Amino acid sequence: MKASAFLLGGSLLLALGACDTTRQQTEGTSQSTAETVTSPTMAAMEKNGIRLTPFDDSPKYPEAQMRLKTPPSGATVPSGAVAFDYDLTNFVLTKMSSGMTGNEMAVSEKGQHIHNIVDNQPYTAHYTTEFTKNIADGQHVVLSFLSRSYHESLKHRGAYDLRVINVGSAPVQPLNADLSAAHMFYSRPKDTYSGNDTKKVMLDFYLVNTTLSPEGNKVRATINGSEFMLTEWLPYTMEGLPMGQN
């Protein structure tokens, strides 16, 4: 029987906050999403047998761009399956990504793809520029971003899209979402990991209109009750997770 670790978004908690680390809501001055990601300055952190290590050896694809053509921002679309259509430049879907650390973790055999997140729910991965996705009636915030084959997000400007759409013809309750404010979206880990994929598990999240620093916004990651303060917007490897649900 294969050993497996179950890693669900509800049990790994992330909170974005300003310099006062006792508060969990977003505070402080909003900043543009980082265009480049520098080499890690944070050291590995370890608590209660869980080790969290930033890494930055993945290919950057700085010229990769994504544009969501459909549905238009603010549009109202029919109930049911919503059609998405993207234009991509300098990024090849289904290609396998290089990167030493990333390829030590769970990898999609289908290659590079698009992550589509609705209302901060678990993402769906898509390997073509056109697809449909069932979305409930109402108003929704949709984040899309480019992803390497091992599910690490591209974090530069132009590699993501954030917009509000309306599904269905019935009157909707406005979300009053301020897309110019600072936002954080959870991405990885997701679902069930087995075999060698349990040894190192990626933690990745997406920031919009902000970045992280020791003096500014930080992310509090709570893993099995242990808190880690993250001051760099980078992917992290998690090691030492016990088998079972985390």
Which residues are covered by each model-predicted region?
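C-terminal motif of bacterial Sec signal peptides marking the signal peptidase cleavage site
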Residues: A15-A18
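Bacterial signal peptide processing site
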Residues: D20-T22
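Short, compositionally biased P/S/T/A/G/V-rich stretches that sit at domain boundaries
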Residues: A34-S79, V167-G195
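Short coil/turn motif common to extracellular beta-sandwich-like domains
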Residues: V77-A83, S97-M100, G195-D204
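Short, well-structured beta-strand segments within conserved domains
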Residues: V82, Y86, A136-R148, F205, ...
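Short beta-strand elements bearing conserved aromatic residues within extracellular beta-rich modules
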Residues: I114-N116, V219-A221
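Short beta-strand segments within Ig-like beta-sandwich modules, predominantly Fibronectin type-III
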Residues: Q121-T128, S226-E232
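Short acidic/polar inter-strand loop motif in beta-rich domains
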Residues: S147-K155, F228
